[in-house]
């Protein structure tokens, strides 16, 4: 049977504090009203004095109630059955006793106290039942232990008898085993002569076994030098491949470096002195950019020159002659080239460039032809023919600078897209 839930009376008393305070307020309010009625009554002097004494006693009870603690009221109500009439009739009763009795008799508090009393009583009964069950269980356990002791004694006796019987059987078996021992000895003596004859061929076979490891060792030795030679060749291949990789990496690194000498700078200044009104800073940076471009183009065509296509062998001769002519004509023009404006090229050029533009043939589109990779044979031929026609036409009909400037301006204006958005109007 399971133990009942523990009832902590102190916790219940603490929970009752709120109820006791609420009931105390109600009782004090009632007593104050009764005191007011007693004082307002009129009559004879004896009746007035009697009413005053009652009112005085009620005031004392009110003061005692205010000083009382709620826990005292609940404990006294739980401990005894309080009768308010008996306590009031006592001549020596104090104001505190009367106040406790008055509060305990209140119907709201009395209900709570009755519930607590019933819970305490049921808890006590449950505890008593648990004690009785435990005592009965202990008695049954004692009886069971006595029975087990008796059964253990019987089992020990049976085991002792069984051991005695086993010992007797073992003795009998030993006596029977001694008799056939003599017969077995004679059989063993006969069997000893057989193994001696069998040992002779075994001894002859042993030296042949010794020769086998020697032959296996001789087989292993010739294979060792071959393995060593293979391992050496593998190591040599790995080292050579690593050296090739390192050398390729160094060559690429040297090609990527930008080579810049004083001799190239002096040569560039000599060539640029031919043009008029040229700035030294711009020429310096332009030369550097040109050299970088030439290096990139040479790197591109170095791979293609190793495997040139057969179809382009005849065209290379024509292009070389054409490029030599163009380079001789446009040499001072290209060396004095500057970064030009995106929108109006005429604004960025100097006066010397304008004079050179009048005198010299305009630059053709085929100047940087060698930088473009030929994709197809037909395109290559068409571009070469266009370059020849343009140079002939421009050399025959040189335009005035003002006409050329207006033409360029119109081209730039035609490239600018027209505004296609909506106009925003701001209303009042």
Swiss-Prot record:
It is found in: Cytoplasm, Perinuclear region. The modification N-acetylalanine is found at residue 2. Residues 213-222, 373-396 have a biased composition (Polar residues). Its main location: cytoplasm. The modification Phosphoserine is found at residues 203, 205, 263, 278, 280, 348, 350. It holds the Pfam family BUD22. Interacts with SRF. Forms complexes with SRF and SRF cofactors ARID2, MYOCD and NKX2-5. Interacts with the N-terminus of SLC2A4. PANTHER family: SERUM RESPONSE FACTOR-BINDING (PTHR23325), SERUM RESPONSE FACTOR-BINDING PROTEIN 1 (PTHR23325:SF1). This is Serum response factor-binding protein 1. It comes from Bos taurus. The gene is SRFBP1.
